[in-house]
Amino acid sequence: DELGLAFDKTVNERLKGVSRERSFEIILEVNGAQETFLSEDKAKFIDKKNEYYKALIKQVTSKDILPGVMDFLNESKKQGILLAVASASKNARTVLEGLGILSMFDYVADASKIRYTKPDPEVFIDCMEHLKLQPWECIAFEDAAAGIEAIQAANIAAVGIGASVKPAVPDVFLDNTEELSIEKIENLLYK
């Protein structure tokens, strides 16, 4: 708002799964304003945007967990499935803590632990290595096209959730998190 740059739901969907810097570049591209800001100014605005974001995520609670996610996590833990989070955000742990589900995950890989962000597969490879798993032993879930590309580059089965995974083509597509179920995903992947 304060920069006079257009930002709507469509733009927001493009920002999923990419770094802070790339997010700002996308916003500038959409507005035809790539040349408007000096590098120092870009860095200031990226920091300011992150401060707004950090203030917002401090308000996250268990009420913000998407439908179907808690049942899926509980079902996974009950079956002894190792769970990891592969996030492009440095704030992943804070969000998981706010949601009250951090303890459900065996590992959290985020932008503070990796050099390259999605669509590079590094964050997924980091999760596999930490959990001592091979790609064929993993299934990864994503709500962003860059994430689907990263999963596939790591040779992991990709489950895309929601329309924002397009134009990427996951191995399994779910309309929303309410469709999450181990049985359903196994049936779709291994039919």
Map each language-model feature to its residues:
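Conserved phosphate-coupling serine/threonine residues in phosphotransfer and NTP-handling enzymes
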Residues: 87
